[in-house]
Amino acid sequence: MIIAVRSPSGTTKINVSDTAIVKDLYVKLKENNVDIDGKSITKTPRDPPLEVGDKLSSLGIKSGDLLHLVGNNNNNNNDNKASSGSNNNNNNNNISKKEISYDEKLPNGLTPRCKHAVGDKCVFCSDAQGMKRCDHPENATCPNCQNKKFKGKRLKWLCNHPAGGKCSNCLRVGKNVSYKCNHGSTATCVNCMDKDDEDQDDNEEDNKDNKDNSEIKKSGFVPKVAIKNEVKTKCLHGPNQKCINCLPKDDPNSIEVPKRRCKNHGINGSCVECIEWRESLKMRLKSQDNPHAPGALVDFQSANIFQQYIANSKYEQQRIGFLFGNFLSDGSVVVDSIYEPPQECKDKQTPTLLPDPLADKIESMASMLGLTRVGWIFSHPSRKYTMSSTEIIQAASYQNKYGPSFVTLILSVNSDGQSNMEAFQVSDQALKLEKTGEFLPTQPDPTKCKLKSPVFEEGTETINADTHFFIVTVPLKAREDKSIFNISFPVENRIPVNTLSDLASYKLEHKDVSPLKFFSDFHFLIFLLENQFLDFQSDFPIICENIRSRSSENLIGYLEIINYQIGDIIGHDQFN
């Protein structure tokens, strides 16, 4: 095997057998005219000398290994006793000076090992000296052994990137280049991290916490505070890091156009890849199977009154109404009452809504009763399509405004002349198109939605989208429980218009019922609100609260007020 031996005169390659001993190496070195007097063979310059009789194989020395021929200080001292005293004294002085220069700091705070400018710090002049994770030479430093509390300049001679870039050594240099970031708003990278800003934010949060604590002591109220830096179960990193699992997911229905950073050109440039990417952003129409509302539970007493009025007009008059009820936890809709706003119907088509001066008050009154707007209903004569393009746009507008579970009820007549009621919603794609204003205000074809920008419909690019892609069927169910509201008072905004005689007839029909049942009529409350029999600010909250709690405690006094006003119309002796 071949062994390399490094000596002060150079490196010598020696060819010995596999059973050779250390003595054979000395012989070979002497044959190659290498001075071996007073020197020993070692594995490293700091290891002890190898025994002359040891086998190389037993010492773990293999072919290709490098050994060292170093001087023996003991032999030199024994051979040169006469001059050793002065040399030893000089060596001791040098060692002591070396120890002093390495252990003690200079007046400017640096040490002889430091290679940076005054004001910077490294492992030898900072409090981080002695960290075991560093594996660099003694005259170097790294981000691991720098003082983490130090806010000065980093050691730029450690950086190997071009000017304007950043690495783990110079993260704290306050120079952010925002256009180089390609991540979301909640993520961070080496380009946008700034420790100084984080420290400032921490101080502001501490001050805010102290202020909140003082306010809590005064008021005694402890607010609910969301836990920050919560790590999800699938994440394997710490609370201050980000991964694919915890980054925000892209919303397919987001109205914001995603940004693309192309490596082929600048911000305002374009290329074939960018054109293909923009083409991929165009919507591809597809049918939606599952609605946001798993079902619509309708009070069929209200639905029958709505249907009877239209049937009595032989579908000459179409109507629109708003559904008031509640949303269940699974997104299903429960309908309690139908409010018909002011409207005008022409040519047997879908009526046009007129300005409603009571819209805000009716919304507030419904809220007092524990109700909210959960849908709308309209009727139409017999036709070949389910919803027109205009109706789809209107439904999408309502659904974006009042929530994804907002439903659309349609009352129609089939070819046999029988009434048919169905529930629908519009798809998420229709919601996105309406939110971004892609629907044109004028729709010439009721079976096609005309758009501003083209979409792909079954592989074909078009601006006239078929309405069938935007309609989602909702299961229509009957309520198993009974609504708390009665439907005896005539519905508002119909022909003929409600008058005081309707109020008198309502009182005569319900003179033997309890005050709770007398007031538990949604249309009767709207009549009181419209004719200002009671004050909306002071009286209606009390009445609505009693209806919600199913109590007649405070309704007797209001019933006497109504009786007195009706008595002026039909005579007070009618109540005796």
From Swiss-Prot:
One GO cellular component term: nuclear outer membrane-endoplasmic reticulum membrane network
Domain of life, source organism: Eukaryota
Biased composition (Low complexity): 72-94
Annotated SUPFAM superfamilies: JAB1/MPN domain, Ubiquitin-like
Segments of skewed composition (Basic and acidic residues): 208-218
Matching InterPro entries: MPN, Npl4, NPL4_C, Ubiquitin-like_domsf
GO terms of molecular function: ubiquitin binding; ubiquitin protein ligase binding
Positions of the MPN domain: 295-430
Pathway: Protein degradation; proteasomal ubiquitin-dependent pathway
Keywords, sorted A to Z: Ubl conjugation pathway
Location of region: Disordered: 67-96, 200-219
GO biological process, one term: ubiquitin-dependent protein catabolic process
PROSITE patterns attached to this UniProt entry: MPN (PS50249)
Family: Belongs to the NPL4 family.
PANTHER family: NUCLEAR PROTEIN LOCALIZATION 4 (PTHR12710), NUCLEAR PROTEIN LOCALIZATION PROTEIN 4 HOMOLOG (PTHR12710:SF0)
Biological role: May be part of a complex that binds ubiquitinated proteins and that is necessary for the export of misfolded proteins from the ER to the cytoplasm, where they are degraded by the proteasome.
Name this protein carries in UniProt: Nuclear protein localization protein 4 homolog
Lineage of the organism: Eukaryota, Amoebozoa, Evosea, Eumycetozoa, Dictyostelia
Protein's gene: nploc4
